[in-house]
Amino acid sequence: MIDEKDKPYLEEKVKQASNILPQKIVDDLKNLILNKEIIVTRDEIDKIFDLAIKEYSEGLIAPGEAIGIVAAQSVGEPGTQMTLRTFHFAGIRELNVTLGLPRLIEIVDAKKVPSTPMMTIYLTDEYKRDRDKALEVARKLEYTKIENVVSSTSIDIASMSIILQLDNEMLKDKGVTVDDVKKAIGRLKLGDFMIEESEDSTLNINFANIDSIAALFKLRDKILNTKIKGIKGIKRAIVQKKGDEYIILTDGSNLSGVLSVKGVDVAKVETNNIREIEEVFGIEAAREIIIREISKVLAEQGLDVDIRHILLIADVMTRTGIVRQIGRHGVTGEKNSVLARAAFEVTVKHLLDAAARGDVEEFKGVVENIIIGHPIKLGTGMVELTMRPILR
């Protein structure tokens, strides 16, 4: 708090600081001073704003700074300290998640499918407080084929039939009934056939027009690969307690499919598949997930990297409107400079292709100027000096 007589002084100081500091920082400083329990004097107001301006000014990037190489070094150097392991996720035996350097490489390489795709699915109010309802949603999500609920299969050559022994425990675990299995088989175009069910959950599938054992084996494989329920790509869905609500963790990812399931909070669904985010939500969302995923990987390893380096990497990867990898098939391979492309990888190919097209080197970037020994246009090299000689 401050004395009433010092309020005009504070307002004047706020006005002056607004010319230098972002408005949010100025507002935060003002609220901090007004909400303090002790009285803040004019000298202390001066010290607060002077220190904020000093720290902010030191944090600014100087004109001409080589921000690209600084960002590369700032992320690459901590990357050498990362572990190369795949970790179990939160102590759950069924789920693994790639962390450390392998995950960082996946992100900057913009891989279409991560090595361990997974989703964190939040539920709507109706489902998130009740474990049974959350389990109901999880069972809708989990992709289940007939082979997942079968303990054994056999073929009766005499009657030309396929025998499926269903596993009652797996049926219960997956939330599937024998009728669900029969309906899934019924949807297949298998010709003329009949299903007989015995008391021990055994299905005997008799075919009328099959006279080849090879055809029978093919039909068996087709039946075992038949979908009963779920979203393609979601191999496993596990309900977990987080705070006062239940969430679902999945092994596998299918963002567009999951969003259509009743009970899923579409505003809170998370996936580590950057390409899916780009396809479903667009390039801005993809940029955001790149920033979040890189930050998470570094934080999990206990590494502190300035967010601006990560922002720059994400901006470069997404600036064309699509997610591009940082490599010869993406950002580096699409540089305008022939020498810059050749300096990275497959040198001869780039030079031959450029010669065949008649490309011209403009020498506007850093790499190409270093190659031929020209001064680079960074730092003091950005300035063109002229000298007026003193005539005597």
Curated annotation (Swiss-Prot):
Entry keyword Transferase: yes
Pfam families the UniProt entry points to: RNA_pol_Rpb1_5 (PF04998)
Biological process (GO), any one: DNA-templated transcription
Cross-referenced CDD domains: RNAP_A
Keyword Transmembrane in record: no
Gene3D superfamilies: 1.10.150.390
Keyword tags: Cytoplasm, DNA-binding, DNA-directed RNA polymerase, Nucleotidyltransferase, Transcription, Transferase
Highest taxon of source: Archaea
Major subcellular site: cytoplasm
Localization terms from the record: Cytoplasm
Example of a GO cellular component annotation carried by this entry: cytoplasm
Catalytic activity: RNA(n) + a ribonucleoside 5'-triphosphate = RNA(n+1) + diphosphate
InterPro entries, alphabetized: DNA-dir_RpoC_beta_prime, RNA_pol_Rpb1_5, RPO1C
E.C. number: 2.7.7.6
A single GO molecular function term of this UniProt record: DNA binding
Role: DNA-dependent RNA polymerase (RNAP) catalyzes the transcription of DNA into RNA using the four ribonucleoside triphosphates as substrates. Forms part of the jaw domain.
NCBIfam families: RNA_pol_rpoA2
Family: Belongs to the RNA polymerase beta' chain family.
Subunit structure of this chain's protein: Part of the 13-subunit RNA polymerase complex.
PANTHER family reported for this sequence: DNA-DIRECTED RNA POLYMERASE, DNA-DIRECTED RNA POLYMERASE III SUBUNIT RPC1
Record-given protein name: DNA-directed RNA polymerase subunit Rpo1C
Source organism of this protein record: Saccharolobus solfataricus (strain ATCC 35092 / DSM 1617 / JCM 11322 / P2) (Sulfolobus solfataricus)
